[in-house]
């Protein structure tokens, strides 16, 4: 018989709809039993997603131990099996009527396909009318974790009704949580189900009751409530957020974000997302009318999106706006364009990339988000900025050019008065007063920067040699306000032109060695870098976007010590450095690496950024003939669990440490981790402005289900903690509970805040409470073990669109 098998057209929708709502977080199923609740059936086809896609076009094969009845009313007895593609239906007995389409399957009814497995007592129905009834069901998901049961299921075409159904991702022998519903209506054509009087139980205790709700049963989205978030903090009080999802169209949707904070009031938020063939975007807005603490309206708008113009060009934008300078402190969130704790950046631009070139045209603007500062701390706006880079090999040579043209603008700065009584709580409003007294008037200007270069990279198996010659030309067009700002000389069109020559050379030696019975490949990699740049007077040049690089091992091999084009240091210097590694030959892992280097200055370096027109540019120590600080980096893998690292800078001129850091990490069993770090940094200009911190964090598994988490981040100079986190986690096969207490510095004044966070993770379903994951992943490096081996997130790296000519040879 080769009739289409239509007995089970429904992949039992409750088994698919609930996991479709699951939170997108890493889940640990390691505590679950390895044995399936419903083991695979003998004789069933292997899971085959390709066969599942074409099952409707395949014939049905029926077999059994005995066949009786007539040609129109066949009866199969004993080990009855129906197979079609990836589908399998087994029963002890099967009676069919080919004229009426009726069938009855009884005794040990079993069904399996690529994504679903089920057992039942009885199944009956009519193939012609596509009506079916299955009783006493137990099911299991095959392609994901989940199982449950139902007293009965009635199917009519693509519409079904489940009676007294359950769903859980727990092991059936220990259902820590389950969803129960007396009645669930399912419509496969529309892609949704409707549950009535559904209850979420943890153990035997009902914790959530839904008298009526709709949910998706496939990838199609549906309007409805999402799981809430809630928490408690000293600043906001009780904090409750109830997302409401709106499915507006296949390619765009929205989420309403009503939020109640007992100390502030109601905040209204929304998130709108769109997607099309050439791009996508997202906009988020929040509005808090009459904040009870600040006594004024608060709000924010954030947008990010891109559009692919063609294979070479892409338009991108990231726009951020907040209503006041305390917004970021009061409503900490993942804000687009967060340049630092004191400012946010908005950018719009179009960017192109080819085989040998990159180009872009963009504009940006900065907004102040620190109430203790005035506009002098903000970077200049680039309105607009155009750049072009090109590089290409020519035989043994390589040539390239960097070109940039920028128009810089800046808002005038107005005086900020601190509170006279020293109180900085600000609960009754902004205690720092922004006055109408202008304390600095900013002019604007344009800058053109060109840097063509040619190099000759030569290399062999044990050496490399790269001579490079470049020419840098920088020209300005300044308005009269800026040109007449001290220390500038009044020249509205200053220029700078100078050559840059460098020679980079290195050797590579290796040998096989053995330590404590383990074979290693030991390398020795000396490197020398000579740089010559003649002196050019640059005090008549403004400083727009230029800052000194933080001195580090990588800085030993750059042709400038500045990030922007407003300063190009003069140099007659030689860097000598060496690196040595011990690589384990069995697997290539690095056991130990040591690097050290120093710059020898043959002349004083006269160019500095001091006394510039831009207060935000800071200042630097002048460089005299002699030697730079020694820079050393070391990493040591004690064993496969324990590693250490250190960075050290010692200044022979002051005979003091400029920088020191020590970090160690120990990996525990069951994904536990312990981190310990010490950081010291000396301000070479202001000895009173130093950094000395200790940081201890851990995830300690007490047993397979309980673990403790914590962080103690302490300022040794201020003698007070910067952040304290303590908490416990309980984990099981299908449920995780996290409880955290956090105390942290919330603003530049050093004020502390307290918060309590709870999160319940119903694995495979969703989570509710506050997002403790985000807090713990930031505070404990390695909270998720994979984070140790991933590329740093984009918000910790340089904007890829901000090409820096100083990083080009």
From Swiss-Prot:
The keyword Membrane applies. It holds the Pfam family LptD. GO terms for biological process: Gram-negative-bacterium-type cell outer membrane assembly; lipopolysaccharide transport. It is found in: Cell outer membrane. It comes from the Bacteria. The keyword S-adenosyl-L-methionine does not apply. Keywords: Cell outer membrane, Membrane, Signal. Belongs to the LptD family. Component of the lipopolysaccharide transport and assembly complex. Interacts with LptE and LptA. This is LPS-assembly protein LptD.
